[in-house]
Amino acid sequence: MAGSDPGSRGSSPQPPHSDWGRLEAAFLSGWRNFWQSVGKERAAPRASAEEVDEEASSLTRLPIDVQLYILSFLSPHDLCQLGSTSRYWNETVRDPILWRYFLLRDLPSWSSVDWKSLPDLEILKKPISEVTNGAFFDYMAVYKMCCPHTRRSSKSSRPMYGAVTSFLHSLIIQNEPRFAMFGPGLEELNTSLVLSLMSSEELCPTAGLPQRQIDGIGSGVSFQLNNQHKFNILILYSTTRKERDRAREEHTSAVNKMFSVQNEGDDQQGSRYSVIPQIQKVCEVVDGFIYVANAEAHKRHEWQDEFSRIMAMTDPAFGSSGRPMLVLSCISQANVKRMPCFYLAHELRLNHLNHPWMVQDTEAETLTGFLNGIQWILEEVESKHAR
């Protein structure tokens, strides 16, 4: 709840080696700074004479720090509603410290982020005085840009002709969209995402058609979403089943045989990779990519290597440019603590990609979040074809 002491939250602190734990500590510090800042003397917006008369016994008579403290218990939606009631409240509810607090509080709990809504991490890590440099910084606009509810509302307000065009185009597509699925989350989790997909009644999995096989890879698995949208997933593992199982049992990383090293890197740069010929054939024919990331909070990552492999797979030299990529921020089960999807997006440097992407929180056991992600990438493919 807004206004609760962040230090009293139920989640236990992460061990010092956790990637997410370090930033989480910075976020909690940001929360504490908010409560300290509202206790300082601040200038309240000047209310008009009419507003003073109308609200003489209301919140406007309270000190501004008390007003902000009370406002922090409202939801962002309620704040926006309050701001529409008068000029005084329209200015007051835009307070940057208040909206920075909402960002710090809500951002880790949001289940998806995309290439249009990823916030700049620096504006959250730095003290507010360094971000604003004495000027007004619109944290309210940043919050609205990132908020999943706002994104859904914007999406639902698209012109109807766009949906009709996309639907008509889908009628003449001969083959269902094909996606290459890869990433450490396919192999490192205690619960197999692939086994959950294969047993899903909502997705109706069937074996791929033999005539559409790719040498050394297979034909993938065809699925049907909502009994109407068909798509095909080519599941790409880094190595053999035996080697993957051994690596998972020993908590080590198996040698990834999908890629060959072009240049050895160091701790800062990482290595550069290229895909092997069989994988290149996959990249040439797919309509998009599904990257399964291990989002369990205790996991240590080689972020630079993961980014380099994503870049190698999505190289536009192997297919059309602008193909979308869905990143499944995956954990085994609901009781496993996860790193927030926005943090994972930053660490994977997804803002450096030149094509649409979305990160979606997913649970391997229940497939929670998976259908939302698939629906997004199917819409992106249809939109691309319609253009």
UniProtKB/Swiss-Prot annotation:
Modified residues (Phosphoserine): S11, S12, S48
Gene Ontology cellular component list: cytoplasm; SCF ubiquitin ligase complex
Record note on modification: Phosphorylation at Ser-11 varies during the cell cycle. It is low in resting cells and high in the S phase and the G2/M phase of the cell cycle. Phosphorylation is decreased during late G1 phase. Phosphorylation at Ser-11 promotes homodimerization and is necessary for optimal ubiquitin ligase activity towards CCND1.
Subcellular location: Cytoplasm
Domain of life: Eukaryota
Keywords linked to the UniProt accession: Cytoplasm, Phosphoprotein, Ubl conjugation pathway
Pfam families for this protein: F-box-like
Domain F-box: 56-102
The keyword Phosphoprotein is assigned to this record: yes
Role summary: Substrate recognition component of a SCF (SKP1-CUL1-F-box protein) E3 ubiquitin-protein ligase complex that mediates the ubiquitination and subsequent proteasomal degradation of target proteins. Promotes ubiquitination of cyclin-D1 (CCND1) and its subsequent proteasomal degradation. However, it does not act as a major regulator of CCND1 stability during the G1/S transition. Recognizes TERF1 and promotes its ubiquitination together with UBE2D1. Promotes ubiquitination of FXR1 following phosphorylation of FXR1 by GSK3B, leading to FXR1 degradation by the proteasome.
Subunit comment: Homodimer. Part of the SCF (SKP1-CUL1-F-box) E3 ubiquitin-protein ligase complex SCF(FBXO4) formed of CUL1, SKP1, RBX1 and FBXO4. Interacts with TERF1; this interaction is prevented in the presence of GNL3L. Identified in a complex with CRYAB and CCND1.
Protein's recorded name: F-box only protein 4
Species of provenance: Bos taurus
Taxonomic path: Eukaryota, Metazoa, Chordata, Craniata, Vertebrata
Encoding gene per record: FBXO4
